[in-house]
Amino acid sequence: METLGVQTNSELREELNRLKEENARLKKELNQHQVIVNNTLDAIFICDNEMRIVQANEATERMLQVDSEDLKKRSVLDFLFSIPKDELNLSVKKFFKKGFLWKEVPIRLDCGATKYIEFLAKRGIGEDFFFVVMRDISSKKILEREFSMNEQLFKDLFDRAVDGIVLFDKDGGFIDANLSFCKSFEINHNELSHLSLYEFIDSGSRKDFDNIWKALNRKGKAKGELPVKLRSGVQKLFEFTITSNIISGFYMSIMRDITEKRSMELQLFKSEERFREIFENAMDAIIIWSNDGRIVKANQSACKIFELPMNLLLKRKLCDFLVDSQQKYSITKRKYAKYGEIREELLFQMGNGQFKELEFTSKRTILENQHLTILRNVSDRKRMEKELRESELKFRKVFNGSMDGNVLFDNQYRIIDANPLASHILGLSHEEIKQHSLLDIISAYEIENLASPARQINFDEMDNEIPFLLSSGDNRKLEFSFKRNIIQNMNLAIFKDVTERKELEERLRKSDTLHVVGELAAGIAHEIRNPMTALKGFIQLLKGSVEGDYALYFNVITSELKRIESIITEFLILAKPQAIMYEEKHVTQIMRDTIDLLNAQANLSNVQMQLDLIDDIPPIYCEPNQLKQVFINILKNAIEVMPDGGNIFVTIKALDQDHVLISLKDEGIGMTEDKLKRLGEPFYTTKERGTGLGLMVSYKIIEEHQGEIMVESEEGKGTVFHITLPVRQNAEERRNDE
């Protein structure tokens, strides 16, 4: 038993020693591994299953720029937040499922810097930790990106270059070309492999091309101009550079089509020739001068304008001829300095001392450090313009100050201009009248007849009249005459408003007629009244003394005598009105009394009279019996023009605060325009047995009341009398009338 125990202790000691040796060896190996891990360039660290960093080497600290103590507080996910969350979660799941993950990912450091790393994570079976190896591949990524960019840049340059780029072999066979080359050579890209550069070299240029090829083989590059002939027969000229052994021993050529350039150069040469011809033979003075103002070149016309020979002119400065005292000179100078071009007119003093007004245009930098000025003598034109302006001013004063309306119009009758009086006469503004045609005022027939050579109008005898309706609705009467072609395509129409004059003449004519009628009426009335009194007396005596049934005869005689008596009364009213007493009365009551008086006569003719009163009608200052006489005259006429019956509409309303309007409308046969104009004239009547005195008396009564009668009529539709009366009459005017 003791022996067994001793053996066991001995074995234990041996085992312990062995374990110590093994432990020392493992520590040694661990230290060696630790040294290797710490000195490796890759970041190596261990994480638990919560992704927290447990242990890391020094390379990890350097790569992540975090010390070891802080690293142990961090999760590896803290550095992977630049990866989209969904993608990161998917990668973590895949790692825990397979135990292995390799990925190239960007990481974001605490300082904000970004690095690209190669990330390797691996976990052992059944282990509750995993290790991660990270390698910084930022430089590699930068190189890859630069290479990719350079490759893409070359491809873009190759594909998008304006110049043609072609790769070909030592025999001239095409390998590849960009779109510009194919377009210039009029070939498709898929044809390139079957074509050679030699096929496009014209036989006359083969020797030159061989020399280019020799220079290329000798120097490794060549440049120059190469004429080619396309398959379509079109000839082009190309500017080229060729480099040998550019890619896999091939040649690369950059070719630019300069056919148009050469053509433009030729055109430019011809243009310069033409400019020289124009410069030397121009009627205007042309001067080229330098920045210091010195004249560099001038044509012969410049010598003539500046009154100097060429050799002296080329020794002068352009500013030497300008008159400094003129105000426009300094303004023109500043404008030219600012804009580099100008068009102006200035006063110049010529070489012989003469002053001339010159119109000029100047432009800077048409040539290097040079300026171009073209000058024209406008002294005569200026003088003519001044005379023309003075003439225009005189014409405008006469035109605008004329006592008649003047209108200028072209051969299509479009109004070009009108003076203020024409605008006033026609009731249109100056702008409005210019938008009209003369045909809007006068018919084409009248224009052609009045302005024809066979009938020249004397402006002092303007006896041609036309009616004209203003936009306000007023009717005017105009006298007019014309003058054709006062200048080319310009005619003159002269208007004079004679409305007031014609109305005055008409009033004078009627006044004279009324005066004569009044005197005649007074004489007739006095001469007839006395015999009439005797006749009435004897008829009454005779009626009482004669036996038999003669009542019908006496009634007829008495009725006719009463009619003669009413005519005598109207004569006396025309001759000299009796003393009139004006008083305030309601015109509505006067009208009602009149309608009541005439109702019996109206009923006999089957005529209905309707009175319509609108709003409150104020009383007016009037002589009621006279107004009643007016209403009787008009209503009786209305009844008589409707023998088959009809309606009379009477409307009374306040026109405004100071006037009352009475309208009497019938449904008779109406009147023509000519008849309307003569209403109120003595002895003018439209009735078979009328005297024409009733309406004349009515007009006179309304005139004495300071009112107005207006008549509207249309044949077949009836007539309307509009009577306007003032609420208060002007006492001064009434005294003058009396």
UniProtKB/Swiss-Prot annotation:
It catalyses: ATP + protein L-histidine = ADP + protein N-phospho-L-histidine. It is an enzyme of class 2 (transferase). SMART domains: HATPase_c, HisKA, PAS. Its EC number is 2.7.13.3. Pfam families: HATPase_c, HisKA, PAS_4, PAS_8, PAS_9. Induction: Expressed during growth and early stationary phase. The keyword Phosphoprotein applies. The keyword Transit peptide does not apply. Keywords: ATP-binding, Kinase, Nucleotide-binding, Phosphoprotein, Repeat, Sporulation, Transferase, Two-component regulatory system. The modification Phosphohistidine is found at residue 526. Residues 523-729 form the Histidine kinase domain. Residues 29-99, 150-220, 271-342, 391-462 form the PAS domain. InterPro entries: HATPase_C_sf (IPR036890), His_kinase_dom (IPR005467), HisK_dim/P_dom (IPR003661), HisK_dim/P_sf (IPR036097), PAS (IPR000014), PAS-like_dom_sf (IPR035965), PAS_4 (IPR013656), Sig_transdc_His_kin-like_C (IPR004358). Gene3D superfamilies: 1.10.287.130, Histidine kinase-like ATPase, C-terminal domain, PAS domain. One of its GO terms (biological process) is sporulation resulting in formation of a cellular spore. One of its GO terms (molecular function) is phosphorelay sensor kinase activity. Phosphorylates the sporulation-regulatory protein spo0A under biofilm growth conditions. Also able to weakly phosphorylate spo0F. NCBIfam families: sensory_box. This is Sporulation kinase E.
